[in-house]
Amino acid sequence: MADLVHLTAAGVSVVLDCRGSSLPAIVHWGEALGDVTSEQLSDLALAAAPQPIGFSADGAVRISILPEQSAGWLGHPGLAGHRDGKSWSSAFTRTGVETSAHGVLIKARDQAAQLDLAIDLELHPSGVLRTRARLTSTAPGTYWLEHLLLFLPVPAETTELLDFTGHHLRERSPQRTAFTHGLRVRENRTGRTGYDSAYVLCAGTAGFANRQGRVWGLHTAFSGGARTVAERNYHGHSALGGGELLLPGEVGLGEGESYTTPWLYGSFGAAGLDDLSGRFHSYLRSRPSHPHRPRPVVVNTWEAVYFDHDLGRLTELAKAAASVGAERFVLDDGWFGSRRDDTSGLGDWFVSPDVWPDGLGPLISVVRDLGMEFGLWVEPEMINPDSELARAHPDWMMAAGDRLPPTARAQQVLDLGNPSAYEYVRDRLDALLTEYDIAYLKWDHNRDLVDAGHTATGRAGVHDQTHAVYRLLDELRALHPGVEIESCSSGGGRVDLEILARTDRIWASDCIDAHERVPLQRWTSLLVPLELIGSHVGAPVSHTTHRSLPLDMRAGSALFGHFGVEWDLTAASSADRERLAEWVALYKELRGLLHTGTLVHGDVADPAYSVTGVVGASDAIFALTATATSDAYPPGTVALPGLDPDRVYHVRPQPPGDAPDGNAAAWGAALPWCTPHGVRLTGRALGTSGLRLPVLYPDRVLLVRATAVSPQGGDLSERNGR
């Protein structure tokens, strides 16, 4: 066993100090160290060791992956629990370290508390670091676990924090604060990931941005209660930590029983947030479960018809969808039980004879005959009190003892920790997927878990509910391996890496107003690559903001995601449908690039504009987007980041998003480079001198294509590889 373990991948090194008998500590997480000898690793640890001064313990105090007060750590403890008030402080002694090419398994024991601990630490080939722990009780009686959090250290140069907040229709809104002494705690008690989750908690050097600064990010991969923390203390320690937020009495370990934490993911960016984000994207794209076939163009019926289900109307909508190039048609809420509005029917997962007297077969036949897949909306974790299921099994609703929580959206939470309720839902979904040709489920979750306990026992049940949902998704995917599933939760209320281990797409927000979607999708993509982010073209007037937006802006925003349409196309003009078909065709042309290339964001000084691009080996697409008026008239230049500095690129506007729609163009003032001929510049010139921004009206987008030029002078096509 090595005293110091060095893991390295994709430009990242992690050095773990396993000397002594206490829990190991990370002494380096950052840029790759290259080939280093064991002597150099020892000197690295020596160089990082502090002087032993302070008052919590004689000798130097270090922060381990699981910090303990018994080691002199007076910050947030990694473990909290007890045996009837005893064994409340842990003191683990390391019993073994097992190493592999990309990971370490640390084993430890607290003999007095009779607890065994196993910590997995892995450095993925993408450079993403992840860790989790398993705690096992080895004594008779019950060990009541309060929390088990793991920590990753960050250096003293991290002086700023970035995390996220939000609400329905505005998820993942960024907020920055100084990283000062003390503890910053972000708790999610909603029973789902939450609109306002910390999402990716980042610590970075002063002024870190998209393309500059050193930055470390941490994501707690759990879809229930979670706690994410950043702590800096007067001993010079700084760390990010996270784990599950447990409610009182949720986890009691009997002899031989274990609890496993969620995975904690860390990513490092030596050159800003794009670098950090790219590692997350590489990690997700490397998974065997990652969707590898082209992401189909989706038409969802929700904002087109809401609850007005009618075979004739939906047939016409399906025909209109097919005419613009749609490849998947999704029937949203309203097809089952008494579900004519959002006040009843949840839980009654039987096709409604009132609106579908012949079942869903006729509509599915229409959709399939038009060459599209069929998808269906479900909300398996919820129940309306006004439903046949609730009347038959009132004890299946989650509650704090005999007191039901307040309803939200006229619904309660179905207790999937109850085996009978779980089996009912699993069997009904299995039956639907078996009976009908369904390729896709939009899996919704439309309320927070409030007073979410098991009615039979009165105990808190968020932990059990979350793991039951994971098990349900796993079982259904095993039974129907070809069916894709979207994670939706009142929009973007459940976006995390653990739900994405079981789903193929996330719905970023119920707001599809492109003005709101520009920042929302930018920050969602900090963790999630574009092919997993559902992004739809809405109606000319947004249903959630009442903002009017031109079609090119709506489609240009949706292009940078998994493209779809949520608009009553039967009411659209023929000109709009023709224009939409052009955007669909462009998405189909570019989706190979968009969904495999490197996502980049410019650091734009002008707050009215943003630059988003995807760069492949020989092709790139950029969106220059204005969401406000600029204080410069005309605006200045912007860099196109991420291109090969030594290659020459043919840069020109990309139809149909090729019109610099603004006052200058309206008055006949041309932007010199913005012609079909464009300009030919090196990636170095484009990444430094850049391009002059167009004068754009607010909420307009200009697409820019950059194609590498062959030595003979011709553009290299995508078929020659990106």
For the regions a language model picked out, list residue spans one by one.
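Polysaccharide-binding surfaces and accessory modules of carbohydrate-active proteins
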Residues: 3-6, 12-14, 25-231, 648-666
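Conserved, mostly hydrophobic/aromatic
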Residues: 11, 133, 256, 299, ...
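Carbohydrate-binding surface patches
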Residues: 11, 604-645
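Glycine-rich, aromatic-flanked loop segments that form ligand/cofactor-binding clefts
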Residues: 57-90, 207-225, 267-289, 326-333, ...
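Short Pro-Gly-centered flexible turn/kink motifs
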Residues: 251-269, 698-705
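Aromatic-lined carbohydrate-binding/catalytic grooves of carbohydrate-active enzymes
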Residues: 292-427, 440
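Active-site neighborhood of glycoside hydrolase catalytic domains
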Residues: 357-359, 391-393, 397-552, 562-571, ...
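C-terminal beta-sandwich/jelly-roll accessory domains of carbohydrate-active enzymes
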Residues: 416, 629-722
